From Swiss-Prot:
The modification Phosphothreonine is found at T391, T393. Keywords: Oxidoreductase, Phosphoprotein. The lineage of its organism: Eukaryota, Metazoa, Chordata, Craniata, Vertebrata. It comes from the Eukaryota. Residues 406-417 have a biased composition (Basic and acidic residues). Residues 395-405 have a biased composition (Acidic residues). This is Synaptic vesicle membrane protein VAT-1 homolog-like. Its EC number is 1.-.-.-. Residues 1-33, 382-417 are annotated as: Disordered. Belongs to the zinc-containing alcohol dehydrogenase family. Quinone oxidoreductase subfamily. It is an enzyme of class 1 (oxidoreductase). The keyword Oxidoreductase applies. GO terms for molecular function: oxidoreductase activity; zinc ion binding. Pfam families: ADH_N, ADH_zinc_N_2.
Amino acid sequence: MAKEGVEKAEETEQMIEKETSKEPAEGGDGSHRLGDAQEMRAVVLAGFGGLNKLRLSRKAMPEPQDGELKIRVKACGLNFIDLMVRQGNIDNPPKTPLVPGFECSGIVEALGDSVKGYEIGDRVMAFVNYNAWAEVVCTPVEFVYKIPDDMSFSEAAAFPMNFVTAYTMLFEIANLREGMSVLVHSAGGGVGQAVAQLCSTVPNVTVFGTASTFKHEAIKDSVTHLFDRNADYVQEVKRISAEGVDIVLDCLCGDNTGKGLSLLKPLGTYILYGSSNMVTGETKSFFSFAKSWWQVEKVNPIKLYEENKVIAGFSLLNLLFKQGRSGLIRGVVEKLIGLYNQKKIKPVVDSLWALEEVKEAMQRIHDRGNIGKLILDVEKTPTPLMANDSTETSEAGEEEEDHEGDSENKERMPFIQ
């Protein structure tokens, strides 16, 4: 049965590969047609695993259902959660093949029935429950927001996930106020830079940040105190602030959970919003997963009570797509747009990548090499060395498997029934 399952998976991937190689005729509007169906380019994840599971393909163009908007995509945001989705390193992963991506920006091209408040031609940004990495998306109107005239599509694609996450944690959960202090990990990333900018809108807020040393020169002016992510930041923080900090924002998990809780002042709030420590190699590692959770300090509610500390979690995607809080998020977006119009915040874009360059872009995220947000620019022409339609084939015509995991320290785990 296992062999049969593998053969079926390989057959599916070969079918997708064949679809990728087809060159349909181009329509007058820039779209493509196969037969009578309009088609579009999209990044497809053929199965969970390494970068070799990604390729550029052609898919049928979606049309808006009741309450949806059809958006001609100009730019898409890349997030660390996309890397975890590719690996299948999330709870209840969807079935593959799928089109990844949760946020994009573009122009409204069509309106579904009952849609009000938007017109064809509006410039917008949007959350999408997958399917964002494509030339066209359809998404419910409650997840779509108009963007200012002076906001570029690249900035708009860098805006929703990062700034909404940062704002909700700081102001809706932790109640950031004047004179407080914040510790944020991955200070050079998209959320980290959004946190730093939002903290600057409140008087006398001290921001402690951790980041790789090569990022320090570029981001040193955005935070008050900056530490090497591999150093003993607990002692460094306590040397500056003996009591600790008011807010800890943790996207790492693992042993950083216990460290973060130990740094909280009385009435302080620790918020976990990611678990990037679970990602080491190119594919999902059961060893890294087990190690990260094993290192998480077991939280004793009585201890929280005695020390007057608060521990919380935040998942923006769950809040939007599973818990129905789109109204709350729309209010947050409106406040953020106001801050943008006042020139108090501005998305930091690390780099732009063509759809064909998605593998290289994801590798940059995996290497933690970005400062700010990586963007897929749908209209960008790929560099010649990367213009391989995001596929790799061997001489036999089969996909070449990438080397998986940490080459210097590849741990092997026994099969668990």
